[in-house]
Amino acid sequence: RSRGLGDVYKRQLTDMLVNLESDSVLGRFKLAKGSMSLVDTKLQTEISKSVAGLPYSLSLGGSAGNTIRAMAKLGCQVGFIGKVGQDTTGDFFVQALENLGVEPVIFRGSKRSGKCVSLISPDGERTMVTYLGAALELTAAEIDPAIFDGYDCLYIEGYIVQDHDLIRKAARTAKECGLKVAIDLASFNIVAENLEFLRNLVRDYVDIVFANEDEAKTFACEAEPLNALQCISEMCELAVVKIGIKGAMIKHGDEVVHVGILAAAKRVDTTGAGDFYAAGFLAGLCENLSLRQCGTIGAITAGKVIEVVGTTFGEEAWEDISRLVNKVRNEKYLF
């Protein structure tokens, strides 16, 4: 029985997107425009009150949240592991997962739920004020084998690797339960700061590694992406190195595949491109498609999300993606 993807994600954040009429609130709270600040709940509440009455929207936040949402839209059966507070924000997070058809494996913490207030200036630039709260309270002790019952793969977002005990326990438990383990390296500076841990984690437990060019070079200590791909593939079963507008290189055993990008894509906002690429690729793997088919679906989902501001688009776009994915399944549309 295949239920697709289990997802461990420590930083469960609800995004509150607020459209500002001016940048005055940034000056009032001494927020550098375009920055991301970690704050306590008191300051975040004060900022939220100061923009009360302005247009806003709520959505699932975080890198893994993007991936899990896209996979659900692609028809995969998915679950989400994390911790929220005992509050209305936590209730929203759980309900949003259920509305997507995602199984919420959500613990309740003692702190308030994590939230990112994204202040959108009239010129479109975002200034983010983040309170992590209960999202930081998920511990290794809460990772139980029963969480992984019925799943094929655990996907780990690289942004949370600073909690070594949690990630190691999740990966080890998933492997013991017979799951594949996939990780997205997330950011080259995080890779550099956790290099020894990440290399050991990949060697010991990880089957699938996603990385962009900078992350791959940092992880492998190689100057060329092809050499980095080779190095990563020697540590795991399947390596995927994304090289921007040149597409992606994929290596499984002796098989190396280069897949292009969605040619029609307009680069409006690259937020979430890597998250959506992983979603498309893993969705293909869940259907046992070829590496080229998986890479093409990843390129389609990534190509579509960069055509919009943010990571949310309408049903018409998803219908277009579904149409293209069906062509990929029939090998009539490959990059």
Task: List each model region and its residues.
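Glycine-rich phosphate/adenosyl-contacting loop at the front of the ribokinase-like
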Residues: 3-79, 335
